[in-house]
Amino acid sequence: VSVTVEGDFRPGNLRLRHAFGEYNGVLMGQTWSNFNSFVGNTSTLDFDSLPGLAGLQFRVAQARYTTGPLSFSLEQPQNSLIDPAGDDAADDKKDGMPAITARFEESQGGLSYSAAVLAHQVGYDTGAIDDDAFGFATFVAAKMALTDMITLQGTLTYTDGANSYLYRSGENFGAASAYVDGSGSVETLSGYGGSIGAGINLGGGRSVNIGYGYVEVDWDDAVSDLGAAAVADQSESNQAIMANYQWTPVKNVMMGVEYQFLKRENVDGSDGDANRILFAAQYNF
């Protein structure tokens, strides 16, 4: 039997990150979603990293069973939907069933790879009217060591009715999974995304990493059913380039500098972009 409890102070006060127990392949508690993999991630200084990474890059309450490279879980569902006016229908959201996931993750020589699927319910219940739909998501991720110095890695994700699991879609971390049309029916929204990157180990604790990520949500049916004005300011695509240099000046200390270019485009065609420089220092103890 093992028990893990971990917290940090990222929001300015103590928050619980992990709290779970494990016994004979059974895990119960809060930790990284089973619909998640880090094998295809490019190393970035930005805590939240690139759009399009594999699955839900968050921690959720769950019950999981692992046997060899296979793992299965029932998890706290993550979904959102918008009403016919284009507003968030969070107050009426129905989460009657857990999300169901299955993942395969393995490594052989210089290749690490992962694939997963997820299914969940997305719906609403106002007390007077209700409806729901089936949503699903899938991803693949891989990392290949080309030489002792160079690695290539990437991810691909597709969702339909599960855009909360399409990393960094929408205005923040996940776009709406569905919308309610004028007749009260739940209609799912699909999306896709991915990332690609390379890492170069320069030796002596020094490395260069560069990655690109992109996600896009298909709002065409929502525009047709709800009208362009209702979803005009919804985020249609997000993309980012991140490039960094990391070094270890002394044992247990990592420092780095990173350049980022970020761009977002809304359903109505309006867009914006930003450039920024990050500096980081990390002490491991």
Locations of regions flagged by a protein language model:
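Outer membrane beta-barrel
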Residues: V1-L81, G96-M97, T101, E105-G109, ...
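Surface-exposed loop and membrane-interface regions of Gram-negative outer-membrane beta-barrel proteins
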Residues: V1-Y23, L27-G29, N34-L50, A85-D92, ...
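Transmembrane beta-barrel strands of outer-membrane/channel proteins
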Residues: V5-G7, M28-W32, F72-Q76, A115-A119, ...
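Residues that define the transmembrane beta-barrel architecture of outer-membrane proteins
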Residues: L14-R17, Q57-A61, T66-G68, G96-I100, ...
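Outer-membrane beta-barrel architecture
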Residues: F20-E22, Q62-T66, R103-E105, F139-K143, ...
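Detector for outer-membrane/organellar transmembrane beta-barrel domains
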Residues: S107-S235
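C-terminal structured domain segments
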Residues: N238-V250, M254-E258
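Outer-membrane beta-barrel "beta-signal"
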Residues: W247-P249, V253, D273-F285
